[in-house]
Amino acid sequence: EYETGIEHPHAQFRQLNKNARGNYLMPLFATSDVREISPRGEVVKITRLEGTPFTTLALANGNHWVACGDGHSLMEVNLDNGEVARRYGENDIKGARLFFVAGLLPAKDGGLYVCNWQGHDKNAVEANSPQVFEINDKGEVIWNLNDNERFGMISTISTIE
């Protein structure tokens, strides 16, 4: 059991993931940090970031992708020391303006699927930016989905095999 110290439930967290050490990575909206929590509920590490962190995704190099929600950004971060290896801001990815960066999913070819939730910006649909897209390791869009009429807001995805 772990108490976040954040009173309003909607300001707490969306997705928890376990890291290689068996601890939980808890991105918190209200405090703009990712907390590493042991299975006993003890804080192991707090890494301060930007925006409203939504989820983390472990990389083979030990870093993590962090979707920074309303920060309109996606970052590759070493959560042990807080060092940012890569950061994509709102207009840094050609062909995909970032809105609320939410769910992340690794692609089989080494790319990254990014859910670009558009619910907090009334101009998002008019911006014609994809709701979900895949980037390669150079940050280039190689696939996208942009069909608000059929799919509405997309915050997370998963694969079905």
Language-model-detected regions and their locations in the chain:
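Histidine-/acidic-rich catalytic cores in large beta-rich domains
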Residues: 1-161
